[in-house]
Amino acid sequence: MTKTMSIRMDRENYEFLTKITKEERSDLSKAVRDLVNRGRVLLAVERYKKGDASLGKAAQLAGLSVVQMMTLLAEFGVESRVEKDDYLEGL
């Protein structure tokens, strides 16, 4: 289910988004959704690195499965703190 929202942003960010949409031949809504999704992933990685989130919580925050999150963390060069429960959760 999708929701519609209205946001305010400064001119610099608006121009940045407009530029991206032109380069990618996309629309503004898609660019915002993509950036939000990327932000979720980066937030999840950061919280996992700091120890503020377990692997399962980080995966949930990023909108990924535990296995996908493990792969993503490896791509970011983040050392895994996988415990037995985390491993079993990913199966």
Question: What is each stretch, according to the model?
Answer:
Residues 1-9, 80-83:
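Short Lys/Arg-rich basic patches
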Residues 7, 17, 24-36:
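Short amphipathic alpha-helical segments
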Residues 19, 50-91:
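Short, solvent-exposed charged binding patches
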Residues 30-34, 46, 60, 71-72:
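DNA-binding alpha-helical recognition surfaces that contact promoter or target DNA
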Residues 40-50:
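Short, amphipathic alpha-helical "recognition" segments used to contact nucleic acids or chromatin
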